[in-house]
Regions:
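Residues at alpha-helix caps and immediate loop-helix transition turns in enzyme cores, especially N-
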Residues: 14-17, 47, 74, 133-137, ...
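Amphipathic helical "hinge" segments at domain boundaries
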Residues: 1-49, 146
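Bacterial carbohydrate/catabolite-sensing allosteric modules
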Residues: 24-33, 79-87, 91-217
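Distinct, well-ordered alpha-helical segments
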Residues: 47-55, 201
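Intrinsically disordered, low-complexity polar regions and short flexible loop motifs
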Residues: 63
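Structural motif corresponding to alpha-helix initiation and N-cap regions
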Residues: 47-49, 71-72, 165, 169
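Short beta->alpha connector loops
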Residues: 43-45, 66-71, 191
Length: 217
C-alpha cells in the first residue's frame, strides 16, 4: 500500500495528527500482511514522479492520499490510470473513494459553541484555502455567524500555507493588533493553536481557543 503525503518537510511530521494516522494504517496493513511504502518529495513534481513509479512499476496494490485539495494532478493521474486509491478528506467527485467527516458542521458547531458562551468577536485561523478541510470549516464558521446575525469580518480570518506554531503566533499578533477585544479563536489545526496559545500566554490574554485534530492531551 502506498501512502501519499502532502509534502516532505518537517511540518508534516511535527503535526501530531498525521503520525497517529500512519500508526493506524500501518497496524491494519500489518494485520493483513501488507507492507507500506511512502511517496514523498519536496515538491509536486517529485511526488508525481514517486507515484508514477509506484503505479507503472506495480510496486503497490493501491494508494492512500493523506490529504485532499483542489485540482490535484496526482489524483488526476491515478484516476486516469484507474488505479485503486482513496482520499483522507473530501472530493467533489462521486466516483472517488474517501474517508472524511462533516467539516462544515464541525466548523458550524465550533463557532456556535462560542456564540452560546456569549462570544461575538470570533476569529478563524486555518490552513491554505486549497485544502477542502479549510474551505469547509470556514464555511461552517461563516454560516454560524450569519445564522446568529453576527457580522463577517475578513480581518478576523487567516490562512496559513503551512501548519506551523509560528504561523499561529504571527496571525494572533495581527489579529489582536486589529481587534484587542477578540473574544474567541478557532483554529483548524493543533499546531496553529499552540502558536495562538503561546501568543496569548505571553501577552496575558484570557481568550478561549478551540482547535481540531489534536491528539495531544
Amino acid at each position: 500500500i502506498g501512502l501519499v503525503l502532502p509534502d516532505d518537510s518537517d511540518v508534516f511530521y511535527q503535526n501530531p495528527f498525521f503520525p497517529s494516522v500512519l500508526r493506524g494504517i500501518a497496524q491494519v496493513a500489518s494485520e493483513n500482511h501488507y507492507a507500506i511504502q511512502i511517496a514523498t518529495g519536496k515538491d509536486e513534481k517529485e511526488r508525481l514522479n514517486a507515484i508514477s513509479q509506484m503505479v507503472y512499476g506495480k510496486r503497490v496494490d493501491g494508494l492512500i492520499f493523506l490529504y485532499a485539495q483542489e485540482n490535484d494532478p496526482l489524483v488526476k493521474l491515478v484516476t486516469e490510470e484507474q488505479f485503486p486509491f482513496l482520499i483522507l478528506g473530501k472530493s467533489l467527485s462521486p466516483f472517488i473513494s474517501l474517508v472524511d467527516n462533516d467539516n462544515i458542521q464541525a466548523g458550524f458547531d465550533a463557532t456556535e459553541y462560542f456564540i452560546k458562551k456569549g462570544c461575538s468577536r470570533i476569529a478563524f485561523i486555518g490552513g491554505t484555502k486549497k485544502l477542502y478541510v479549510t474551505q469547509d470549516r470556514l464555511t461552517g464558521y461563516e454560516q454560524a455567524l450569519q445564522e446568529h446575525k453576527l457580522s463577517l469580518d475578513s480581518h478576523r480570518t487567516f490562512f496559513a500555507d503551512e501548519f506551523l506554531e509560528e504561523k499561529g503566533y504571527k496571525f494572533s499578533k495581527q489579529l489582536f493588533e486589529y481587534d484587542p477585544k477578540t473574544d474567541a479563536v478557532i483554529t483548524t489545526d493543533s499546531l496553529l493553536a499552540e502558536g495562538v496559545c503561546n501568543y496569548l500566554n505571553e501577552h496575558q490574554l484570557n481568550v478561549p481557543v478551540l482547535s481540531f485534530d489534536s491528539v495531544n492531551p
